[in-house]
Amino acid sequence: MTMTDPIADFLTRLRNANSAYHDEVSLPHSKIKANIAQILKNEGYISDFHTEDARVGKSLIVQLKYGPSRERSIAGLRRVSKPGLRVYAKSTNLPRVLGGLGVAIISTSSGLLTDRQAARQGVGGEVLAYVW
């Protein structure tokens, strides 16, 4: 069965594993998912990620991050632009998540960027997700 929205599936698996306090989660690999994982790592929401070759394709293994008393680093994830309703933002009107405490992941002509990186470079694009 084909997946309609692989990015939403990626975010849902992360959200579910985070809610269940799993240490890591295995996901089907794709370049865009690896780029999103890289942004999450750079922003401090996950501890690390790597790819593994499986029998039927690559897997992306994401290690989740928790605080000293097991508090979650990811409080919430939300898919913004969906296949049925795309959401775009101009460079002058980029979204801010929780007043700058969260991160918006934006697909631009320069690749995947956070809202702060896109504002610094003066580019807009498709708003993929909010993370806080």
UniProtKB/Swiss-Prot annotation:
Record keywords, A-Z: Ribonucleoprotein, Ribosomal protein, RNA-binding, rRNA-binding
GO MF assignments: rRNA binding; structural constituent of ribosome
Listed InterPro entries: Ribosomal_uS8, Ribosomal_uS8_CS, Ribosomal_uS8_sf
Entry keyword annotation includes rRNA-binding: yes
Top-rank taxon: Bacteria
Subunit (UniProt): Part of the 30S ribosomal subunit. Contacts proteins S5 and S12.
Family the entry assigns: Belongs to the universal ribosomal protein uS8 family.
Its biological purpose: One of the primary rRNA binding proteins, it binds directly to 16S rRNA central domain where it helps coordinate assembly of the platform of the 30S subunit.
PANTHER family: 40S RIBOSOMAL PROTEIN S15A
Name of this protein: Small ribosomal subunit protein uS8
Organism per entry: Mycobacterium marinum (strain ATCC BAA-535 / M)
